[in-house]
Amino acid sequence: MNRIHAVILDWAGTTVDFGSFAPTQIFVEAFRQAFDVEITLAEARVPMGLGKWQHIEALGKLPAVDARWQAKFGRSMSAADIDAIYAAFMPLQIAKVVDFSSPIAGVIDTIAALRAEGIKIGSCSGYPRAVMERLVPAAAGHGYRPDHWVATDDLAAGGRPGPWMALQNVIALGIDAVAHCVKVDDAAPGISEGLNAGMWTVGLAVSGNEFGATWDAYQTMSKEDVAVRREHAASKLYAAGAHYVVDSLADLPGVIAHINARLAQGERP
């Protein structure tokens, strides 16, 4: 049938870890541990969605971070420096990721509703496999079990913003057309991934990296603060090319109904 057959979901900030805090804090700690260089949480969020080595590389190219690095070492960050930070990052992330494995509010019910419609649940992440091998069973213990998952270092072709992890889900799940898939993500590289794979794309403006608040902080925010943060996040996701932007995964079934109507009219992503 000419309808959505699969969703491919990001992990941190999309299905688990409201606000995407597990990776951001670890980047700050890894820079400090490896080279005694300080970066801010806001800086750590800028390249979110990329593979973690590529994320560190992108952080080193941020003008403010590069200026700090040059002031300390008299040069810009090298590949060997990135390797050293990544080596510090990995054990920290592996140790901490299980603490951020609880599904975001509404995720379990949404997954059940999608499966009731015959929709398969794929997933992929900017986390490497060593981290995912800890996160996946921890999330399963909380009730979140996608039908398939792909880590950023699984494929020789690479990770985001390329289409390969999303397309690997298409293959593994046996989906007949990429136009029958929706890629859901809270960061721009994941939206680019979906677009490059020829899929419909949905950005999440509140639950993830661009909004950047814990669940508790979000619950106590004023309506005005929520609106400002939501608009900031949505503008970035729309600028990346998202077909739709909603607050969280709980809003996805309504979006899929809208996409199904467009598919029935012959539209494509």
Curated annotation (Swiss-Prot):
Maps to a phosphate-starvation-inducible locus previously known as psiC. Induction: Induced when inorganic phosphate is limiting; this is controlled by PhoB. This is Phosphonoacetaldehyde hydrolase. Its cofactor is Mg(2+). The lineage of its organism: Bacteria, Pseudomonadati, Pseudomonadota, Gammaproteobacteria, Enterobacterales. The gene is phnX. Its EC number is 3.11.1.1. It is an enzyme of class 3 (hydrolase). Keywords: Hydrolase, Magnesium, Metal-binding, Schiff base. The active site is at D10 (nucleophile), K52 (schiff-base intermediate with substrate). It comes from Salmonella typhimurium (strain LT2 / SGSC1412 / ATCC 700720).
